[in-house]
Amino acid sequence: MQLQKIIALLLGITMSIVSVSASAAAKKTTQEKQQAVWVKHNYGVKGAKLTPTKVRDKTYSYRLKGKSYTTLNKAASRLYSHSGYASYYGGKFHGRKTASGEIYNKNAFTAAHKTLALGSYALVTNVRNGRKVIVRINDRGPFSKNRIIDLSVASAKAIGMYSLGVAKVKVEAIIVDANGKISGKGAETLQKHMKKAPLAKTKSKII
């Protein structure tokens, strides 16, 4: 009789552990699915769709106009957050090959950066008006003094700087892994932006 009680007790403990583990796993899966949905919708911000892309993790150095630059790997790119001036490029560059090998499209949400990993994303915020855009880094530049990023025409229009030509911005890196999970300084800002979104608008985007 005593043995049966012990067996029953052990079975009860085992079932409780399994139940807790299943609950935790289900919660994690739900959170991952919800995040994947938000990745699809860009957290309510205009720009390049946040999808898993291959990021060039190998660093290299190059020299241009008498100055040397060393690119950032994936881990270092995640920590990138800097303010400075943005410009944009289009016109004669439209249709040309970029540093990543892609053809530059002035109507796509892309950008050139001197060191961020090619294939990574960045959240660019216009400091003057607060407007944001998500861009994918597929080129190198700009190499003009005091410029930290060169936006495509579409990206410049999205943050209201097209007519000005130059604007002060904040650039924060975003990395999207193979499972659709985002990380980096830009990801932190996007999550804060999501929390500030109106409830009705948030629901519509989750659906």
Residue ranges and their predicted role:
Residues A22-I207:
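Secreted/periplasmic proteins
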Residues L10-I17:
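Bacterial N-terminal signal peptides
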Residues M1-L9:
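Bacterial N-terminal signal peptides that target proteins for export
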